[in-house]
Amino acid sequence: MKRSIVLILTVFSVLQISAQRNEIFSARIASLQVVAGDDWLSPPVINLGAETPMNIAFDDLTHEYHRYTYRIQHCEADWTPSEGIFASDYIDGFAEGNTIDNSEESVNTNVLYTHYSLQIPNERCSIKMSGNYQVTVFDENNNDEKMFTACFMVVEPKASVSLNISTNTDIDVNKSHQQVGLELNFGSLNVTDYANQIKTVILQNGRWDNAIINSHPQYVMSDGLRWEHSRDLIFDAGNEYRKFEMLDVNHTTMGLESVHWDGKSYHAYVWKDEPRPSYVYDEDADGAFYIRNSDNQENDRVSDYLTVHFRLMSPYVGDIYLNGVWTNDRFLPAYQMKYDDMEQCYLGSVPLKQGYYSYQYLILGADGTTKPVPSEGSFYQTENKYQALVYFRGTGERTDRLVGYQQAQLK
């Protein structure tokens, strides 16, 4: 008989996330993409031992060839490097010193660049342990300068994870929030001390800036855990992401008011973003982006770069940033909007490669937390995607493994 216990007070191990998000250190690097197979709409997660590769691609904004090498590092659930294991525990082949051999120069573009790409696994290395992974790329031509880090996850589905999304929350009902329910079945895992062995992460649209880390479960069963109407798992619903597409440097396409050449570079102006007082469904990509051009051929080396200009019509409400997968979920000066008192709006500009982009505006508070911009609205109907990550460290084991993953969307 399954036993269920309501948790009155339990000390659940605290998990502080360090730096999961991709990070670019060199101004030469642009358009960093980390994609599982060809699924650019989902977070970078692959199954251990599956044929789906992890694809990492980027541009170096020069036509000079650079000999890039990379290091693969297994990380704990909190994204700190795993110090209790050896590289041979998680990699078949070589964990560092591998070169990125695939490169091609841009053709007929105003902005010169060289496109580089790699797949994992490859003939030099393959992954043999689940968990979090960080790939660091170095420029061997320049004293092994660190160029960027790219993050992805490998899951071995040992545990069963189910997610449900509700607009009936402990804050409001069918208004501006969404609540996540989570049920975890231990499956074949030998869980003797769940509070120290199990770690959970809940993401909204793959974002780590508002991730819910190690929320306390409401119920403990002999074979699993359940989170039901947990106040910790309530998210601002926000609104559907905005979107635009740059396919041609001479003509406007979806979401663009104008495109022009100033004698030195191309500029694209997104239609000004007016307040959204009510919810209107608009299919989007939840922050994802996809590089392509009007011919949809040789997208990686024929697509050009344009300076994209954004305008958000809003009174001043604090520090507002552009956010999407293409910002690497980071709140940097390059993505901060500047307020124009004369125009009563926020203005921003970012150089981007031709393609499809979805984006949102977020307010960044002094405490580092983010929230939706009031003029953008927050509506319970918003079709957000949620992801659950479950990590496990068994008795006597030396690192955290990713043993469960699930994604669900509010419909």
Give residue ranges: language-model regions.
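Bacterial Sec-dependent N-terminal signal peptides
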Residues: 1-21
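Low-complexity, Pro/Ser/Thr- and charge-rich linker/hinge segments at domain boundaries
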Residues: 23-24, 154-177, 380-404
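Contiguous beta-strand segments within globular domains
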Residues: 31-76, 173-186, 295-310
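Short acidic/polar inter-strand loop motif in beta-rich domains
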Residues: 77-79, 125, 139-147, 207, ...
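Aromatic-rich carbohydrate-binding modules that target alpha-glucans
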Residues: 91-116, 208-217, 307-354, 366-396
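Basic K/R-rich, polyanion-interacting modules in nucleoproteins and related proteins
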Residues: 268-316, 400-411
